């Protein structure tokens, strides 16, 4: 089959732009988008297997590629007018193949793979709208941005003969983002009037591999035991950590004594280990070499979850859950060192009729964090900070 869809969006949106005298200002910017989405697919369904081949093409066009505004706080040094680029035209294509096949009653295999490409080559704006810097030479006419993506997700499920009512799922997933955007030096002009030193663009890319094994055992009709192991390896470019390995061990107990009552207890332990931390710097603003970004720092996480589902009557469902997460960044000297989060959730849905459902929920989160910082380049004055956040929804 084949589908075509066009999305038109017009009007105004909030836009934040910097001006000379203050850090920024909000004002309405024009909005006029058009997205053309074309999808075609071939499907096969057999007694033992299914397959689907799909192609997607998306074209995004913006009739307003820039916005210009007057500076109400002009100082008379060429900052009377400012300009900024808006969302650029771009094109996305993706080809995917998904399928599943049942070899025997004990073994089933499924998988999905896709390759994609994103391209953006809208001409650059000048560094500044000011006549003094408007002709400052750019390294090239456009970004010539090219991004290639690929993903392979393979999984198989089969029953082991090691014990009765025991089954296992093994899965592997590879996800890659290959950024082919050229790297060049740029000489930006800050706030239209301040020429800055050279800086290069950073075409970020990553390569993620994930594999996992899950076991499920049902010793009785009302009881189920589950557990598993997962390893994820993430490789990055132009970032402080080039490689991260995270191992996850988990176990879960499920008890369903009645059809209207179901409870689950789950425990997870995650251990993230990184390669050598290499400070990238922020051009003319150096970073503390002891500082660690929390998403790239070594971390040990313990997480526990309790969840209960109740169905006292046919048209009423109640879910109550509680989880606690304890994070320890024991290798971080500057940055986030500890974090603890707890959450209580209540979800209720009531079906008035086949066409009407009433739904409500309540969530209370508590987050406690410990951070360390430094007030001197030599790190002789290290301070500690503590934060507490409460969020109710």
Residue ranges, per PLM feature:
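Gram-negative and organellar
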Residues: 1-393
């Amino acid at each position: 089959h084949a589908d075509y869809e066009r999305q038109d969006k017009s009007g105004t949106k909030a836009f934040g732009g910097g001006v000379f005298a203050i850090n920024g200002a909000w004002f309405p910017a024009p909005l006029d988008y058009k997205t053309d989405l074309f999808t075609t697919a071939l499907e096969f369904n057999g007694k033992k297997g299914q397959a689907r081949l799909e192609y997607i093409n998306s074209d995004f066009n913006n009739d307003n590629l820039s916005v210009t505004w007057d500076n109400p706080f002009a100082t008379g040094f060429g900052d009377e007018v400012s300009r900024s680029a808006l969302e650029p035209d771009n094109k996305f294509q993706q080809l995917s193949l998904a399928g599943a096949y049942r070899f025997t009653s004990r073994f089933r295999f499924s998988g999905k793979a896709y390759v994609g490409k994103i391209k953006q080559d809208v001409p650059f704006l000048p560094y500044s709208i000011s006549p003094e810097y408007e002709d400052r030479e750019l390294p090239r006419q456009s970004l010539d941005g090219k991004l290639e993506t690929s993903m392979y997700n393979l999984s198989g499920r089969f029953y082991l003969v090691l014990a009765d009512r025991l089954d296992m799922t093994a899965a592997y997933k590879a996800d890659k983002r290959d950024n082919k955007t050229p790297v060049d030096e740029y000489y930006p002009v800050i706030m239209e009037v301040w020429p800055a030193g050279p800086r290069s663009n950073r075409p970020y890319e990553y390569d993620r591999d994930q594999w996992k094994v899950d076991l499920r055992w049902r010793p009785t009709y009302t009881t189920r035991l589950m557990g598993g192991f997962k390893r994820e390896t993430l490789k990055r470019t132009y970032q402080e950590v080039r490689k991260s390995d995270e191992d996850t061990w988990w176990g879960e107990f499920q008890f369903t004594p009645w059809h209207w009552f179901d409870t689950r207890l789950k425990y997870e332990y995650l251990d993230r280990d990184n390669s050598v931390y290499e400070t990238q710097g922020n051009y003319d603003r150096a970073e503390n070499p002891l500082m660690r970004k929390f998403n790239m720092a070594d971390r040990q996480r313990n997480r526990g979850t309790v969840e209960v589902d109740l169905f006292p009557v046919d048209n009423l469902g109640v879910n109550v859950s509680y989880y606690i997460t304890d994070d320890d960044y024991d290798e971080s000297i500057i940055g986030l060192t500890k974090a603890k989060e707890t959450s209580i959730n209540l979800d209720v849905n009531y079906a008035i009729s086949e066409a009407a459902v009433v739904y409500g929920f309540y969530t209370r989160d508590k987050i406690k964090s410990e951070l360390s910082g430094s007030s001197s380049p030599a790190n002789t004055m290290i301070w500690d900070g503590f934060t507490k956040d409460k969020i109710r929804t």
